[in-house]
Curated annotation (Swiss-Prot):
UreD, UreF and UreG form a complex that acts as a GTP-hydrolysis-dependent molecular chaperone, activating the urease apoprotein by helping to assemble the nickel containing metallocenter of UreC. The UreE protein probably delivers the nickel. GO terms for cellular component: cytoplasm. The gene is ureD. Keywords: Chaperone, Cytoplasm, Nickel insertion. This is Urease accessory protein UreD.
Length: 277
């Protein structure tokens, strides 16, 4: 056996594997979870319908932590006209590791006229974690998206800095007839100068958006005392937030969502019940 084959087999054998596939379908004016398949410790609770047609789903990872060699895959498919809101009851925690990289891969496919709200808790990378995060959203014509991603490097609430380890994060949003967003962030332990020394980074994306939506968002951001900015890339609104306080950052994201949901989706805010616990 070649060395490369032994290394590949070693990384494949290490850690847990989990895969969750969800398909949302619209019928009779209501979105249903039409199909679900899961392998390993990644699953969902029963759907909630606090506002009628949209389907609210909580994604669960019972172990609570991700360690060396773990491979988690999330595959979400929305059929035409469907509307799903997905969130999580807790943060995704990437623990310290001296072994293979822990990997989280997320794929979201939005067919024509569908709507996705992806509002997860933060991903926390403990000092010494070796992690890869790869998220890709593919939107067909008429699809609508509200999605955020929060990266917490170290545990600032406990005074722990991300002094060791490595993070490789990719985020792609593919729009019809538009370049969309394709970015990559790589941080090795202690290199928080890329973030101006801030341990918390959030990206909030909304599509489709226009200059009037951008103006509403910038008005809210002007009230903040932490670094923030927003820009339009064609019809894609991209918001960046830096912070030292996770609770403050989560509160800011929720405030933005309360502004963007009616502006982009034409719906009043209906917060997931888990946010109140």
């Amino acid at each position: 056996m070649l060395l490369a084959e032994r290394v590949e087999q070693s990384e494949h054998d290490a850690g847990w594997s989990a895969h969750l596939q969800l398909r949302f379908v619209e019928g009779g004016g209501v979105t249903r979870l039409g199909a679900r398949r899961h392998f390993g410790p990644l699953l969902v609770q029963r759907p909630f319908y606090p506002e009628g047609a949209p389907c609210h789903v909580y994604v669960l990872h019972p172990p609570g932590g991700i360690v060396a060699g773990d491979r988690l895959e999330l595959d979400i498919h929305l059929e035409p006209g469907s509307h799903a809101l997905l969130t999580m009851p807790g943060a995704s925690k990437f623990y310290r590791s001296i072994g293979p990289t822990a990997r989280l891969t997320q794929r979201f496919h939005l067919q024509a006229g569908s709507t996705l709200e992806w509002l997860p808790q933060d991903s926390i990378f403990f000092s010494g974690a070796r992690a890869s995060l790869d998220s890709r959203f593919t939107l067909e014509p008429g699809a609508r998206l509200l999605a955020w991603e929060t990266l917490c490097l170290g545990r600032p609430v406990m005074g722990e800095r991300f002094d060791q380890g490595a993070l490789d994060s990719r985020l792609s949003i593919e729009l019809p007839d538009d370049p969309g967003l394709h970015e990559r962030l790589r941080i090795s332990g202690g290199q928080l100068e890329k973030l101006g020394g801030h341990p918390l980074l959030a990206t909030f994306c909304a599509s489709p958006a226009d200059p009037s939506v951008l103006e509403k968002v910038r008005h809210l951001l002007d009230e903040l005392k932490t670094p923030a900015g927003a820009t339009l890339l064609g019809s894609l609104l991209v918001i960046r937030l830096l912070d030292h306080d996770n609770q403050h950052l989560q509160h800011t994201l929720q405030r933005l969502w309360h502004v963007l949901r009616p502006a982009v989706l034409g719906l009043p805010a209906c917060p997931p019940r888990i946010w109140a616990t």
